[in-house]
């Protein structure tokens, strides 16, 4: 049974009405609409979560006012796509799809460069802590070559990681194993920046060792 809308080319639907219509489109993928006596077809394009509204010609009213029919469909389409026609939304999606791999590749390169520059040979004698605090969160072993990483992007708490295990995570674009955030260069910390807090029993940024927030 078609969805019947009381809608004109000048009317703006409420967000609740639009969300209800989006839900119908997402569930059925293709749904027939009747708008002011004119038949239209609503399509949901799932891979970009956008909507296309197409006039369905056939009746005398459609043939006599084809332009008005198209404008009505376009207005509804723009509202469903939050200000874009489907073609505009598709072009924007393609532009973002082309840009994202390049951007992520640049970020990954920056992270790897920082990992390599901050890596160091791990020696237990260099640290005033029990060996258990030197275990890598990935391998659960003390690394031969390690690098300090923040526990989250905005955390002042750090952990020691195995260089090779961390490099593999970056290569796979895997999230941070503790915070589940995407890795960013700011998470990588040099050995000189870290200090083991004997009271709290964790590594933290040297400048903020007295006000570290546990994360």
From Swiss-Prot:
Its EC number is 2.3.2.27. Gene3D superfamilies: Effector protein NleG (3.30.40.80). It is found in: Secreted; Host cytoplasm. One of its GO terms (molecular function) is ubiquitin-protein transferase activity. One of its GO terms (biological process) is biological process involved in symbiotic interaction. Its main location: secreted. Two sizes of protein are detected upon expression in C.rodentium; only the smaller protein is secreted. Keywords: Host cytoplasm, Secreted, Transferase, Ubl conjugation pathway, Virulence. InterPro entries: Effector_NleG, Effector_NleG_sf. Residues 136-189 are annotated as: RING/U-box domain. It catalyses: S-ubiquitinyl-[E2 ubiquitin-conjugating enzyme]-L-cysteine + [acceptor protein]-L-lysine = [E2 ubiquitin-conjugating enzyme]-L-cysteine + N(6)-ubiquitinyl-[acceptor protein]-L-lysine. A motif (PDZ-binding motif) lies at residues 213-215. Effector proteins function to alter host cell physiology and promote bacterial survival in host tissues. This protein is an E3 ubiquitin-protein ligase that probably interferes with the host's ubiquitination pathway and targets host proteins for proteasomal degradation. Can ubiquitinate ubiquitin, giving rise to polyubiquitin chains (in vitro). Does not complement an nleG8 deletion in C.rodentium. Interacts with PDZ domain of host GOPC via NleG8's C-terminal residues. Belongs to the NleG E3 ligase family. Interacts with host GOPC (human protein). This is E3 ubiquitin-protein ligase NleG. It comes from Escherichia coli O157:H7.
């Amino acid at each position: 049974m078609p969805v019947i809308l009381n809608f004109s080319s000048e009317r703006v639907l409420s967000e609740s009405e639009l969300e209800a219509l989006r839900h119908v489109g997402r569930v059925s993928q293709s749904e027939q609409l009747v708008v002011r006596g004119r038949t239209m077809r609503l399509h949901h394009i799932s891979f970009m979560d956008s909507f296309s509204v197409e006039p369905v010609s056939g009746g005398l009213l459609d043939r006599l006012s084809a332009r008005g029919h198209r404008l009505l469909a376009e207005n509804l389409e723009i509202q469903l796509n939050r200000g874009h026609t489907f073609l505009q939304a598709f072009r924007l999606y393609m532009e973002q799809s082309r840009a994202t791999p390049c951007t992520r590749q640049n970020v990954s390169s920056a992270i790897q460069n920082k990992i390599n520059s901050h890596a160091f040979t791990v020696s237990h004698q260099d640290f005033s802590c029990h060996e258990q605090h030197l275990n890598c969160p990935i391998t659960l072993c003390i690394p031969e070559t390690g690098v300090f990483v923040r526990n989250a992007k905005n955390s002042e708490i750090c952990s020691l990681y195995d260089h090779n295990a961390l490099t593999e995570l970056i290569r796979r674009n895997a999230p941070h194993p503790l915070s589940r955030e995407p890795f960013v260069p700011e998470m990588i910390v040099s050995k000189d920046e870290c200090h083991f807090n004997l009271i709290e029993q964790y590594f933290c940024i040297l400048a903020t060792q007295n006000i570290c927030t546990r994360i």
